[in-house]
Amino acid sequence: MIKSIQQFEESGIKKLEKIIESFMKDPKDMASFVYGIRDEVIALGLDLIKETLEDCNQMLCDSAKRKQSWEVVRTDGKKLTTCLGTVCFEKTLFRNKQTRKTAYLLDRILGIESHERLTEDAEAKLLEEAVQTSYRKAGEETSLTDRVSKQTVKNKLHRLTFPQLEETKPEKKAVEFLYIDADEDHVSLQFKEKKGDLEVGENNWKNNCVLAKLVYVYEGIEPESPKSKRHKLVNPHYFSGVYEGADNAKLWDEVYAYLDSHYDLKKVKKIYLNADGGTWIQSGKKRIAGITSVLDEFHLQKYLLKMTSHLKDSVDDARKELCDAIKSGTKADFQEVVERLKVCAETEATEKRIEESGSYILSNWTAAKIRLKDRETVKGCSAEGHVSHVLSSRMSSRPMGWSRTGVDKMAHLRAYYWNGGDMLELVRQQEQELPVAAGAENEVLSCESILRWERHRHNKLGKYIESINHSVSTEVKKYAWFNAHIWGL
């Protein structure tokens, strides 16, 4: 680190002075001034990272503890892309004296694989961009002065695993009502198992759709601000993914685990499930006891409109009669109104549309009745809008083709993003924590080791050693801290 600062004192400051001089001559060129400062600061940062990593590698080479078990093979170059740019440094390959296996011990201490080219900060930046824009754009924004390929972005996404639910909180919330909204996004696939295996249907459309399921839990709705007409969900939490076949039960188990860990379910009077009545959604009632299904307002009004759109000036009266039959009548009363509407149909297509719409409401009869009767506690369903914002805006609103794995991982990542997840923490969740030798963190360096390190620094720095009056204790601390990691090898 000292060498980088020395170099900056000798050349970097002069460059900054020239940049400032240029700005003073032409104050209107603010952009060049800012860019120039930025470039010099980034260059200093990359030099500091390079020197620090090489110092760590040198500590490994000089370590008496390392020499007991590992011997030096050779020194190789290494490139790591950080969020600042690409750092080029040297690291040493060692061979274990007993097993004869080779390893880059610096990589072990840093917690990175030998072939890894991205640091965790760069990978976090990559995910922050990929969750909102394209793979290509994410690759361009990974680093300030460098980029990675869109293939690298895809590979990182496909290898993601997502953290398990956090442990039960000591104090659970006590609420009277909870709400679960559920719907799905229809995402286009490039292929099912391999390229070229998509089937074309009778209508000449490719059968290339996969469902990205979305479920979210919330406590109710409230105005965005005291005088606002817009509303927002209270403490929403999102779950998303493909969850095909038997995995659908896993989705609902995750929802239940969240409810059980965050709420005192014994004090909850009702849990409302707002949805369109899809099979995968209704199966959630088998995994979470006490759920009350409610037909979402969008689909209810959609099918009421289909049944009455041909009546022209009598639309409102017919729709009111249908709603009254659902709210206060029986299925027979509703079917009677449907039959009268079919008599007024002018074409077979209209009659068929009325029949299908009526059958949909009858198949979700109880859910539709609760929607119209229990207006005080039942909240409007925003599933369609949330699918658009949470999933479609990234996955299907524009012409895109995905792999099945890509759909599942991106859906999970979008839910993680909307839950306020930290991408850096997600990256760290992927890493295997390396074992540390017992007692290594308490290992005390000998006076001889400390003095040898200080003499080495003094010879290397020469006259500059006196210019940084606090550096001795700081360097000793760094040596001691890093030595504990060497003992853990």
Language-model features, listed with the residues they occupy:
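N-terminal accessory alpha/beta regions
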Residues: I42, L46-S69
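Catalytic center-proximal scaffold of phosphoryl-transfer enzymes
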Residues: M1-E51, F94-L489
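Short, flexible, mixed-charge glycine/proline-rich loop motifs
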Residues: E71-V72, G85-E90
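Short acidic, Pro/Gly- and aromatic-enriched capping/linker segments at domain boundaries
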Residues: C61-L80, A368, D374
